[in-house]
Amino acid sequence: MGSQSSKAPRGDVTAEEAAGASPAKANGQENGHVRSNGDLTPKGEGESPPVNGTDEAAGATGDAIEPAPPSQEAEAKGEVAPKETPKKKKKFSFKKPFKLSGLSFKRNRKEGGGDSSASSPTEEEQEQGEMSACSDEGTAQEGKAAATPESQEPQAKGAEASAASKEGDTEEEAGPQAAEPSTPSGPESGPTPASAEQNE
């Protein structure tokens, strides 16, 4: 593709030439936007050309964005600081143990016992407790649903272990149990009855 000037008829004036020739465009603006291809001088050096073509705009700095004086910044931070002070990050305490995604969350007595402020709840802790009570209802329902299949699984493992010990130590009876792959879950990953018999 070529540039627009190559496609323009000879008699027509291109947009760049019209912008350069127009007296309104003498300040470096093109279609209402300032051109930034090196035509403008840096603001730090000497006088800059007037933005609107008038000398009044260059002298007036009331519309320019200025940094706030330090006293106003301190006042603004002073307003925010009291709000941030009571919102200290606190450790979340669970009143009831629950399971979420197979993980068990239980209250740790060591953390709660050493802290004297934990024995007398403050207003914020009471509000947090009310908010957590609402969220605990949803997690408790999820925990019950997750706990039922997991609680049945350890009972089944216990039944298999007791059946294996009652039947005896024969290799023929241990064969079917060894053929069934069992996946250990969580802290109950002790030796399975089949592996215990093989070790003997």
Swiss-Prot record:
Purpose: Involved in the control of cell movement by regulating actin cytoskeleton homeostasis and filopodium and lamellipodium formation. When unphosphorylated, induces cell migration. When phosphorylated by MAPK8, induces actin bundles formation and stabilization, thereby reducing actin plasticity, hence restricting cell movement, including neuronal migration. May be involved in coupling the protein kinase C and calmodulin signal transduction systems.
A molecular function GO annotation: actin binding
Protein origin, superkingdom: Eukaryota
Induction: Up-regulated in peritoneal macrophages in response to bacterial lipopolysaccharide (LPS).
Record-level GO cellular component terms: cytoplasm; cytoskeleton; plasma membrane
Organism of provenance: Mus musculus
Positions carrying Phosphothreonine: 14, 85, 148, 170, 183, 192
Keyword list, A-Z: Actin-binding, Calmodulin-binding, Cell membrane, Cytoplasm, Cytoskeleton, Lipoprotein, Membrane, Myristate, Phosphoprotein
Result of changing residue 120 to A: Complete loss of MAPK-mediated phosphorylation. In neurons, induces the generation of large, flat lamellipodial protrusions
Family statement drawn from the similarity comment of this UniProt entry: Belongs to the MARCKS family.
Chain intervals with Low complexity compositional bias: 16-26, 53-64, 156-165, 178-200
Protein name in UniProt: MARCKS-related protein
PTM (free text): Phosphorylated. Phosphorylation at Ser-120 and Thr-183 is non-redundantly catalyzed by MAPK8 in vivo. Phosphorylation at Thr-148 is preferentially catalyzed by MAPK8 in vivo, but this modification can also be catalyzed by other kinases in the absence of MAPK8. May be phosphorylated by protein kinase C, which disrupts the interaction with calmodulin.
Subunit-structure text: Binds to filamentous actin (F-actin), but not to monomeric G-actin, independently of its phosphorylation status. Interacts with calmodulin.
Bias kind Basic and acidic residues: ranges: 74-85
Lineage: Eukaryota, Metazoa, Chordata, Craniata, Vertebrata
Key word Electron transport present: no
Gene Ontology process terms (BP): cell population proliferation; positive regulation of cell population proliferation
Topology in membrane: Lipid-anchor
Sites of Phosphoserine modification: 22, 36, 48, 71, 93, 101, 104, 119-120, 132, 135, 151, 162, 165
Main location class: cytoplasm
Bias (Basic residues) ranges: 86-98
Effector domain involved in lipid-binding and calmodulin-binding: region residues: 87-110
